[in-house]
Amino acid sequence: TRCSRDWSSDVCSSDLLKAAPPPPQQPSSPVYIPFAFTGIKGTPDDFHLPTANSAIIALIEAVVSKEGPISIGLLSRRVAEHWGVSRVTSRALNRVDGLLRRANVKITADDGKVFIWPPSQVPKEYTDFRVPGQDELSKRDAEDLCPIEVANGALYLLEQHVSLPVADLVRETARLFGYARLGQNVDKAMKSGIEVLMWSGRAKEDGGVVVVR
């Protein structure tokens, strides 16, 4: 399959992108609901101690169960904040990364970006996508969107229009996920998802227009 395990890429980014107000919700467009902060469990120094391993693993599983598929960068932020870590550095990211193998989760990667899934989900059979709600934390950075999820959102739009020029599909998919403008990261994330959609055989490009197969 396209997704494969790849631990060589640092997908954590501080390049925050402002999201637009969400589009009107559709029954097939569930809102992305973030994991609720459960309280401080220790200090930033405690986060890196072996004694915190069990608590970190439990939080990994809880966050992934709520938000998966979730990028390793966003997962690390959700987990690390319980130890007062306000900014996820490569050290904190590696801390979570190092415990993933011990957690009951699935791990995939696309173009070097690692995403974590609940054990009950089958990535290649995943057909859902989630849009931002009113909670600020439900508005994900573009690099935290799983390409498979973006592909599903793009397909949802194509099924309404039958076909769209590539540029229009990129723009409308970005809008669906709450982005008012196409910055570099947003554009890249949308195009990556559309590429996954076409690779999956559910759509094709013909003369600059993407058509549902």
Language-model region placement:
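Positively charged, polyanion-binding regions of nucleic-acid-associated proteins
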Residues: 42, 50-71, 139-165, 176-177, ...
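A short acidic, leucine-rich amphipathic alpha-helix
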Residues: 75-79, 169-173
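Charged low-complexity interaction tracts in eukaryotic proteins
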Residues: 27-51, 90-145, 188-213
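Terminal recognition/anchoring or ligand-binding modules at protein termini
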Residues: 178-182, 197-198
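Acidic, proline-/serine-/threonine-rich low-complexity intrinsically disordered repeat tracts
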Residues: 16-29
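Single conserved hydrophobic/aromatic residue that forms the stacking wall/gate
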Residues: 1-15
